[in-house]
Amino acid sequence: MNEESTRYVDVNYSDLDKELTYTTSEVAEILNENESTIRYWCDCFSDYIHIEREGRNRKFTKSNIDDLAFTKELLKKERLTIKQAQKRWEHIKTQPSQNTKVISTTETTSQENVLNEQALLKLEEIKKQFLNDISTQINNTISQQLSTALNAHNEALEQTKVELKDYISATIEDKLEANISNLKAHIDATTENTNKQIHQIYDKDVELVNDLKKHMEERKQQNEEQNNKKGFFGKLFKR
């Protein structure tokens, strides 16, 4: 198969194995705060709340969100200043056994519900993206093979199946073995159906060509007969 004619979408499935992370806007929604407030707290309490970055963007874990929720309790419920809240954090970090971070049960439950909803949405997005990518790869492969000659069709499709199987196996390994089997069965069924359609089209084309040849022969014979008649009458009137 021509390497340039077959391209696959690069799918990143790292989220299947890694802990879910959240953006600043998502954290702001979970904690019911403005994004600017979340960024301000992150800067003020960076010595106590360690948040990873991806480029210039922060990636919040569940633990980070819990720490920010505790910080919100200190500032909004206990009415502490930034410096007082920093001292509370310092005390917690230096003597963790004597201090615990307490957040109201109602707010914790609400945050847990939002977090669970966000996690389900992310998993659903991953699932949809995976299915869309696989569907796109199959449709592109079939469309490409339909435009090739009959002799190259089977060879090209077999190569495509091998590459698809290797690609999917290398990307998602054991987690999608069942999907690979279903995909192979789908491609086999599609191949059989495609071959039938191509043969049907080919047979119709042959029949059409034969009919056209027959029609041309009949027209040729009619023209010859008319020419013969014209020649006969021409000779008759010249006498």
Swiss-Prot record:
One of its GO terms (molecular function) is DNA binding. The keyword Coiled coil applies. Residues 138-239 are annotated as: Required to bind TubZ. Residues 229-239 have a biased composition (Low complexity). It holds the Pfam family MerR_1. Residues 150-229 form a coiled coil. This is Regulator protein TubY. The gene is tubY.
